[in-house]
């Protein structure tokens, strides 16, 4: 059963939609392409590294023992994650010295 909405409720719905549209637009502008490229490369590495490690070591290094090959695959995923964390920690936040000085000036 449908219920009637008052005019005030319609205005609230409109402001919510406008805020959602504005925040979605800001989110699209917020990510540099270098960050997206790094994320895609790490995602591909997280898929390919364990599969390649597992099937590459299953019959060569591990002699057919899937437990050891699986353990090496898990280690390879952890190596990829550690590399990503190091890259993310070293990455600049994108805030320049002028922006920092501007923020400090506004706080005073």
From Swiss-Prot:
Keyword tags: Cytoplasmic vesicle, Endoplasmic reticulum, Membrane, Transmembrane, Transmembrane helix
Membrane topology: Multi-pass membrane protein
Listed transmembrane segments: 35-55, 69-89
Residue ranges annotated as Cytoplasmic topological domain: 1-34, 90-108
Lumenal topology ranges: 56-68
GO cellular component, one term: endoplasmic reticulum membrane
Pfam families tied to this protein: VMA21 (PF09446)
UniProt GO BP: vacuolar proton-transporting V-type ATPase complex assembly
Compartment(s) where it occurs, according to its Swiss-Prot or TrEMBL record: Endoplasmic reticulum membrane; Endoplasmic reticulum-Golgi intermediate compartment membrane; Cytoplasmic vesicle, COPII-coated vesicle membrane
Similarity section: Belongs to the VMA21 family.
Task performed by this protein: Required for the assembly of the V0 complex of the vacuolar ATPase (V-ATPase) in the endoplasmic reticulum.
Protein name (Swiss-Prot/TrEMBL): Vacuolar ATPase assembly integral membrane protein VMA21
Species of provenance: Ajellomyces capsulatus (strain NAm1 / WU24)
């Amino acid at each position: 059963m449908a219920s009637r909405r008052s005019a005030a409720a319609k205005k609230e719905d409109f402001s919510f939609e406008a805020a959602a549209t504005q925040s979605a637009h800001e989110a699209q502008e917020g990510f540099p392409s270098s960050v997206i490229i790094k994320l895609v490369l790490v995602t591909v590495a997280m898929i390919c590294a364990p599969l390649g490690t597992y099937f590459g070591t299953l019959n060569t290094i591990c002699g057919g023992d899937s437990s050891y090959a699986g353990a090496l695959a898990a280690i390879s995923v952890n190596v990829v994650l550690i590399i990503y964390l190091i890259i993310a920690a070293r990455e600049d936040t994108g805030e320049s010295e002028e922006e920092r000085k501007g923020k400090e000036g506004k706080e005073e």
